[in-house]
Amino acid sequence: MYTQDRFMSPQYKARFKGYVQVTKPGIIFGNLISVAGGFLLAAKGDVNLALMLASLVGLSLVVASGCAVNNCIDRDIDAKMQRTCKRVTVTGEIAVGNVLAFGLALGVLGFSILALFTNALALLFAVIGYIVYVGVYSLYMKRNSVYGTLVGSFSGAVPPVVGYCSVTGQMDMGAAILLLMFSLWQMPHSYAIAIFRFNDYAAANIPVLPVAEGMTKAKLHIVLYIAVFALVSALLPLAGYTGIAFMAVTCATSLWWLAMALKGYRHGVDIQRWARQVFGFSIITIMALSITMALDSQVIKEQVIGQTNLFTLVK
């Protein structure tokens, strides 16, 4: 009874909630969708459920680890930002050492699952993405360079590639397109956040593009990155990895997103509201494309099988 009462106590619940929060569940969920999208794109309907589960769980734990360690690294700048000043690593509700140990334990478990159940290439991408996010981005680039977002975009693009390579075991054109596509998506998504959270980033002296070089340049970069993202996304169907459904969805979402970005140049536009709209639609775009590429790749496989069967009959 004592043990049960202890686990049900408000203090225990608050501590448990704190440990969950440092892993950033929203980010984990978004990465789960992209991992599944990359995996199913490569599988083309021939899904190994055990392998898929291992990829999803392993990568989720790696992402959770990176987020927890990032909370420890960023606690000084988090204290200066309204959005993050209540994090447990800032308030001291949970000791930083405990959060760090928790994060590293999650990483060991996640990498172990990927090592045991996927393949060397998937594991390698996960390791590189982790090192870039924790070691390069969080420890140095985020604080010291306007190019921090660009570096961070690589680690954000790794999850779908891990999912894809878990199936194929090789770095082919499909994996390269995914890596480039998701890296490009990260840029306008992140710049939009930096605009509507401008005061926070300025208070913490983080040199994101809007703070370091102004809103005009940030708006231009958002438009340019969305335009290039649209072109790169179209490479998946053009290269035969997906079909017409993906092409239709990528054209519709990318053009709508681009049109939304161009509204930032309207006279008298509410820049904060505009940035939130660009950010919100960036999530809709990447979710729609992740789901569509997973489903549309199955159609491609069925078409290939049908053509093969027809060829066999004619022969």
Swiss-Prot record:
Give me the segments passing through the membrane. 25-45, 49-69, 87-107, 120-139, 145-165, 176-196, 220-240, 242-262, 280-300
- A single GO molecular function term of this UniProt record: protoheme IX farnesyltransferase activity
Question: Any idea where this protein resides?
Answer: Cell inner membrane
EC number, UniProt record: 2.5.1.141
Pathway listed:
Porphyrin-containing compound metabolism; heme O biosynthesis; heme O from protoheme: step 1/1
What else the UniProt entry mentions is: Carbon 2 of the heme B porphyrin ring is defined according to the Fischer nomenclature.
Q: Which PANTHER family match?
A: PROTOHEME IX FARNESYLTRANSFERASE, MITOCHONDRIAL
Annotated function: Converts heme B (protoheme IX) to heme O by substitution of the vinyl group on carbon 2 of heme B porphyrin ring with a hydroxyethyl farnesyl side group.
This protein is called what? Protoheme IX farnesyltransferase 1
Organism of this sequence: Shewanella sp. (strain W3-18-1)
